[in-house]
Amino acid sequence: MARVKRGNIARKRRNKILNLAKGFRGGNKNLFRTANQRVMKALCNAYRDRRRRKRDFRRLWISRINASARINGTNYSRLINGMKNSEIIINRKMLAQLALSDPQCFEKIVSTVNN
């Protein structure tokens, strides 16, 4: 029987994990077992946070809109309700950007909604 040279596929698998672990600190970057654990944890965190990012940005936009709306004499919920009633279709991302970069335009939107 011929001699079996082992390790090609195993080495590829291990190197794949170790490449994903680049930039980790200590043994987490070059010891396979700990690197594997850290990579699995990192991938779990990345998966979770890709979903969380959407929530976080929406919360940020809402708080920015609310702060600007309160400066203009109303609050977030009344502003959004008024926009729906007066059929102004601007999403929260664009509204927050307007509140930040163009306060005069945001003020006009608030006055339109209030009237």
UniProtKB/Swiss-Prot annotation:
Q: Extract the coiled-coil ranges from the record.
A: none
Q: Which PROSITE patterns match?
A: RIBOSOMAL_L20
Q: InterPro entries of this UniProt entry?
A: Ribosomal_bL20, RIBOSOMAL_L20_CS, Ribosomal_protein_bL20_C
Descriptive protein name: Large ribosomal subunit protein bL20
What the protein does comes down to:
Binds directly to 23S ribosomal RNA and is necessary for the in vitro assembly process of the 50S ribosomal subunit. It is not involved in the protein synthesizing functions of that subunit.
Which Gene Ontology BP annotations are present? Answer: ribosomal large subunit assembly; translation
Organism whose genome encodes this protein: Prochlorococcus marinus subsp. pastoris (strain CCMP1986 / NIES-2087 / MED4)
Q: What keywords sit in the KW lines?
A: Ribonucleoprotein, Ribosomal protein, RNA-binding, rRNA-binding
Source domain of life: Bacteria
Q: What would be an example GO MF term here?
A: rRNA binding
Q: Which gene encodes it?
A: rplT
Checking HAMAP family in the record gives: Ribosomal_bL20
Pfam families xrefs: Ribosomal_L20
Q: Which family does it belong to?
A: Belongs to the bacterial ribosomal protein bL20 family.
- Asked whether the keyword Plastid is assigned, the reply is no
Gene Ontology annotations for the cellular component aspect, listed alphabetically: ribonucleoprotein complex; ribosome
